[in-house]
Design a protein with these regions (language model features):
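Charged, low-complexity intrinsically disordered regions
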Residues: 1-151
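Conserved pre-motif I regulatory segment
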Residues: 139-143, 147-184
Length: 184
């Protein structure tokens, strides 16, 4: 098939064909990760479990505005939300309560979950804006996508060579009808 242009490729956060270095670069740039934390916070992808993991996501200080306010909440920082997004999971915030029997159980906190879901959508939109901005990255990703993912095209059937002996000569089949017969 013909190569696709960047405008024709939809890239979602969590796409496994995107190299983890790009995800990590997006994370550092978007969340303004301090240089001293960049060594401890890193993105990993396991092809065996098909799971993304952000190592060191809890080492971020609570006074980090990007991680806990702009792209995260007080209950789920931006790195945790990004990890859920990479694994194609909706972020959920639970509270632990004690029931009448004295057993602890987890209950979904709807208000905090809604707030975290809004932050998750903000991160997804930021990624869509960021991924194609750099011309060099754009060129590399378009080439990679076309080589790895854009390799299948629908078959085209041509029945123009088929003849039908014994068919009524008054009936002539159209090209699409012959192609449909070739398909079968």
């Amino acid at each position: 098939p013909k190569d696709l242009d960047a405008s024709e490729i939809e890239v979602r956060l969590g796409a496994t064909w995107i190299d983890k270095e790009y995800i990590q670069q997006f994370m550092y740039e978007t969340f303004n990760t301090p240089f001293y934390l960049q060594r401890s916070i890193e993105v990993n992808y396991s092809s065996f479990t098909a799971e993304w993991q952000i190592k060191g996501k809890s080492s971020v200080s609570y006074n980090d505005v990007a991680a806990y306010t702009t792209y995260g909440t007080s209950r789920a920082n931006a790195y945790k939300i990004l990890e859920d997004s990479l694994n194609l999971r909706d972020v959920r915030i639970y509270d632990t309560i004690e029931d009448a029997d004295g057993k602890e159980r987890r209950v979904l906190n709807a208000k905090e979950t809604t707030l975290a879901a809004q932050k998750q959508q903000t991160i997804r939109e930021a990624f869509k804006d960021w991924i194609w901005k750099d011309p060099e990255r754009r060129q590399t990703l378009v080439r990679q996508y076309n080589e790895e993912m854009n390799s299948t095209r629908p078959r085209e059937y041509n029945g123009s060579h088929i003849t039908f002996g014994g068919m009524n000569p008054a009936i002539t089949l159209r090209e699409h009808q012959k192609s449909a017969i070739a398909h079968v």
